[in-house]
């Protein structure tokens, strides 16, 4: 993961089982992945600009009509495996994230939270403090950085929960957080992942 020269303007729009996703990046580097309408997405409230994004197909049919950069293909491969419950997941695309040193430290720690597990904001704060070689960091500051994670799902901020298992917030909507955690639990248990399980309806066509 690197942290310079990020391209944060979404260029692609992809249907998913939990609603449309917006992708940003350049070359082999993914710099942004947001649910449409998500807080902190650079274009969440600019319908005209969003309409200019290149529409992608979930099944890869777009490949015949578009010369896509590598980050798009690797991101799609990962997302299709994730939502299909195909474990182990393929490698993540290379990430090029833009944020403060503190935010980057938080996002790096998010990458270490395993699939189908959760971690409290307080426990995450301890890990961030260790990474930054500080005695402590504020839990609220950590929560703020989690909320501004620019790569949903792949950088798994949905696995961070409140004290005593309370869900806490999620920039993409708490309903999606519930759905993602439930999905990962079923995959880890070896249960079949059916399209009807998805909170937001049918899988992408």
Please describe what each predicted stretch is.
Residues 1-133, 183-205:
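Basic nucleic-acid-binding alpha-helical/helix-turn surface characteristic of O6-alkylguanine DNA
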Residues 129-144:
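Short, positively charged loop/turn segments that connect secondary-structure elements
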Residues 145-147, 153-154:
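Major-groove DNA-recognition helix of helix-turn-helix-type DNA-binding domains
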Residues 146, 161, 171-176, 181:
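DPxDG-like acidic metal-binding loop motif
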Residues 152-169:
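Charged low-complexity interaction tracts in eukaryotic proteins
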Residues 165-171, 176, 189, 193-198:
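Charge-rich, low-complexity intrinsically disordered segments
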């Amino acid at each position: 993961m690197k942290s310079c020269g990020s391209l944060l303007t979404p260029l692609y729009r992809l249907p998913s089982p939990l609603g449309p996703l917006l992708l940003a990046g350049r070359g082999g580097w993914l710099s942004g992945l947001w649910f449409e309408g998500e807080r902190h997405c650079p274009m969440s409230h600019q319908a005209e600009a969003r309409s200019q994004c290149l529409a992608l197909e979930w099944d890869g049919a777009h490949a015949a009509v578009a010369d896509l950069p590598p980050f798009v293909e690797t991101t799609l491969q990962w997302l299709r495996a994730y939502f299909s419950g195909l474990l182990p997941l393929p490698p993540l695309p290379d990430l090029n994230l833009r944020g403060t040193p503190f935010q980057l430290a938080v996002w790096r720690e998010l990458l270490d939270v395993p699939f189908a597990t959760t971690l409290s904001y307080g426990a995450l704060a301890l890990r961030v403090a260790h990474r930054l070689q500080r005695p402590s960091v504020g839990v609220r500051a950590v929560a703020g950085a989690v909320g501004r994670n620019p790569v949903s799902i792949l950088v798994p901020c949905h696995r961070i929960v409140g004290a005593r298992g309370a869900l806490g917030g999620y920039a993409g909507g708490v309903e999606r957080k519930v759905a993602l955690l439930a999905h990962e639990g079923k995959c880890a248990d070896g249960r079949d992942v059916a399209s009807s399980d998805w909170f937001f309806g049918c899988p992408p066509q």
